[in-house]
Amino acid sequence: MTQLVRNVLVNKDDKRIVFRGKLDSLEALFVLNQTILLEMQEDQEFIDDLEDILVSLREMMRCDVLDEPFTRETIIGLTHEELRAHSHNPMKYYKVKQMVLPSYKLGKTYALLNQLRTAVRENEVADAAAFHNGKSYDRADIIEELNRMSSAVHIIMCKYLAKIQNQETS
């Protein structure tokens, strides 16, 4: 048995405990990829953006454990509305196509960012399963934030592509 919230004990395979384990793994993946990007001497801006998402992940875990609402007004410096606009129209903001499919030709940084994006999406699915309650979700705040996080990583990927394109034309 393990503690879910307050004095509520559940089995280790409880969906919320599984979700927390996946969230913990996601945090570790962000730290590992930040370390790799730092060793590759990648732009600090990308590492800082990933740190901002990591801060949200840690706050998300805290809010779930303490059964508190999760609220964060910005991610990577963008409001929820700006995040949506940037992720749905990267051509307007970054001069790159939307969701360029990953390829080894785009390099290790793009592959690492895509790995993080897909890991966030996997966590979103685990979260939906953990908090599904009949026809609704108990923690829609967390589900929505994970969706925003995958958009944020997509935006970081777009920023990276814009950087590559600028280097090629310089």
Describe the role of every protein-language-model region:
Residues M1-S170:
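Phosphate/pyrophosphate-binding loop motifs in nucleotide- or prenyl diphosphate-using proteins
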